[in-house]
Structures are given as C-alpha cells and as structure tokens.
C-alpha cells in the first residue's frame, strides 16, 4: 500500500477488490500474467485508475470518462476543500 495511514473511500475498496481478482486470475494457468488490463466508465474508470497505479501486475488501464478526480486534465475553478471528487475518491 502506498498510503497506509490514510482514510479511503469506495474507489479504494473497489481497487482492493480488483487486486484480489488479479490474485485469482493469476492462479489460473491459462492467464498471461503480463497482459492484465482494466477498463471502467465514470466512477469505474476512477477506480480502475486507482487499482492500476497501486498494483504493478496490471499492465494497462483504459478509463472511459473518469471525469473530475480521474484521468482528465483540469484546473480547479472553484474553491473546494479537496481537489478530489467528494463521492468516491480520497477525502
């Protein structure tokens, strides 16, 4: 884990579940270990990104429309307490 003392939201829990799914996949002899890829849409895209950056076994992440706090390049135009989305990511 990268941030062992941090509080986590739903995306972190889902990313943890993805890590366990990768464990299960890698126990199958027909799975190519260096070819694991993730995709997700909206909140699923954010969670796929988080899972991919916290597990080196995931080779490719392809988020779709992951929005604010996800893969989009954006500037914080309004004053907020946190630059991350308030409904799923780090807060």
Please identify what each model-predicted range represents.
Residues 30-42:
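Alpha/beta-hydrolase fold nucleophile elbow
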Residues 60-91:
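Mobile cap/lid helix-loop segments that gate and shape the active-site cleft of serine hydrolases
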């Amino acid at each position: 884990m990268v941030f062992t003392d941090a509080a986590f939201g739903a995306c972190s829990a889902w990313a943890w579940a993805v890590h366990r799914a990768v464990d299960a996949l890698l126990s199958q002899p027909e799975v190519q270990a260096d070819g694991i890829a993730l995709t997700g849409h909206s909140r699923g895209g954010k969670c796929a990104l988080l899972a991919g950056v916290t597990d080196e076994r995931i080779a490719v992440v392809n988020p779709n429309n992951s929005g604010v706090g996800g893969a989009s390049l954006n500037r914080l135009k309004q004053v907020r307490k946190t630059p991350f989305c308030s409904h799923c990511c780090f807060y």
